[in-house]
Curated annotation (Swiss-Prot):
<protein>
    <recommendedName>
        <fullName>Hydrolase phiM</fullName>
        <ecNumber>3.1.2.-</ecNumber>
    </recommendedName>
</protein>
<comment type="similarity">
    <text>Belongs to the LovG family.</text>
</comment>
<dbReference type="InterPro" id="IPR005645">
    <property type="entry name" value="FSH-like_dom"/>
</dbReference>
<comment type="function">
    <text>Hydrolase; part of the gene cluster that mediates the biosynthesis of the antihypercholesterolemic agents phomoidrides which are dimeric anhydrides. Within the pathway, phiM releases the C12-fatty acyl chain from phiA. The pathway begins with the highly reducing polyketide synthase phiA that catalyzes the formation of a C12-fatty acyl-ACP, starting from one acetate and 5 malonate units. The hydrolase phiM is involved in the release of the C12-fatty acyl chain from phiA.</text>
</comment>
<dbReference type="InterPro" id="IPR029058">
    <property type="entry name" value="AB_hydrolase_fold"/>
</dbReference>
<dbReference type="Pfam" id="PF03959">
    <property type="entry name" value="FSH1"/>
</dbReference>
<dbReference type="GO" id="GO:0019748">
    <property type="term" value="P:secondary metabolic process"/>
</dbReference>
<keyword id="KW-0378">Hydrolase</keyword>
<feature type="active site" description="Charge relay system">
    <location>
        <position position="87"/>
    </location>
</feature>
<dbReference type="GO" id="GO:0016787">
    <property type="term" value="F:hydrolase activity"/>
</dbReference>
<dbReference type="GO" id="GO:0005634">
    <property type="term" value="C:nucleus"/>
</dbReference>
<dbReference type="GO" id="GO:0005737">
    <property type="term" value="C:cytoplasm"/>
</dbReference>
<dbReference type="InterPro" id="IPR050593">
    <property type="entry name" value="LovG"/>
</dbReference>
<comment type="pathway">
    <text>Secondary metabolite biosynthesis.</text>
</comment>
Amino acid sequence: MPGLRILCLHGQGSNTEIMKAQLGPITKLLKQNGVATFEWLEGTIPTEAGPGVSGVFEDEQSIREACEDLEDYLEENGPYDGILGFSQGSTLLAEFLCDFARRNPGNEPPCRCAIFMNGIPPYRMGDDEKPIIDYGLLEHFPSIPTLHVVGKKDFVYEYSTILQASTASAWATLIAHEKGHEISNDTRIVQKINSAFEQMSIRIALGC
């Protein structure tokens, strides 16, 4: 069974080279085991470095542009079996998948699985500078297998668990590590991620 072809979306204030380094132990093991191969998409929205939930998708126009850019890239370079997003890359991924399903009812989703690392569901910033989850949009999340890797000390931990619960119409697994808003390369966590990818690959092959 061929490995999954995965497209990776980096987070706020980051880039593809940083994300490659952050995911290095994970992608190395998955490649060695023939489970998945990875490609990287550079973001087009300038942002400040560091964690945070403001400053990226502050208006409807920037959200639409980011989703359109991702859809265009997939049409030109796909198909991909799955898409992986870290931090704001996860938010874009969730936004894109829900919006695509809402605009194209009955169509196949643009990928067959999704991986969210330290993710936040689609949201808009409230007047108090706190994210307001767009539950109406989340209702359109496609029925595809998802993997959620979250940090128990992450400032978005609560939002990450909301995202996982909102995608549970299909197979959705949660892997929690003891760190914060970062990609954990703890050997035990890396092995768990490898196992989850293997399970997703089997489910995709079986069409469930």
